């Protein structure tokens, strides 16, 4: 939703800046894992958190932070840099040219599952990050993800598999 608030600001919707600020505060506060880094996948009603770190969530933090930076929020650029650094450290795999999916909370155990949903949202986030930072490596990464997806689709009668093994072999079951 944070990205939508940025769009709202540029469309002139009153109150959008207040919503951007609330999003930045949430991402810098309760949603942020100050002990292990990164962001919690979910906050429970009792104030706890779900015990994992999802690529999907971190991509959305990049998207939200990109919007906040674009909107001129005073902490937007700092949040974006933190999100990109965390993503690069834990989720982006340069060798594969794809993102991994799920870590435990401490970032010590990587789940073998690989999925396209997280990579789809990574493309969205990286395009926004490239627009805000001017760093073209994020567009290049998007191209690598897209090239993989086109290859898998062409090998599967133009149907795009969503689930993969740790070696990026389609899991069609």
Name each model-derived stretch:
Residues 2-173:
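Glycan-recognition and catalytic cores of secretory/periplasmic carbohydrate-active enzymes
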């Amino acid at each position: 939703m944070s990205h939508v608030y940025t769009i709202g600001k540029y469309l002139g919707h009153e109150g959008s800046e207040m919503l951007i600020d609330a999003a930045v505060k949430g991402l810098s506060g309760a949603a942020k894992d100050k002990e292990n880094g990164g962001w919690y996948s979910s906050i429970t009603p009792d104030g706890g958190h779900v015990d994992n770190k999802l690529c999907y969530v971190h991509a959305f933090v990049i998207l939200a932070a990109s919007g906040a930076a674009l909107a001129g929020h005073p902490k937007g650029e700092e949040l974006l840099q933190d999100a990109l650094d965390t993503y690069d450290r834990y989720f982006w795999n340069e060798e594969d040219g794809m993102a991994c999916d799920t870590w435990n909370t401490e970032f010590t155990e990587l789940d073998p599952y690989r999925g396209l949903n997280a990579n789809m949202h990574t493309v969205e986030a990286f395009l926004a990050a490239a627009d805000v930072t001017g760093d073209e490596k994020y567009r290049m990464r998007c191209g690598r993800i897209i090239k993989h997806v086109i290859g898998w689709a062409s090998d599967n009668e133009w149907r795009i598999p969503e689930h993969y093994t740790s070696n990026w072999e389609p899991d069609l079951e």
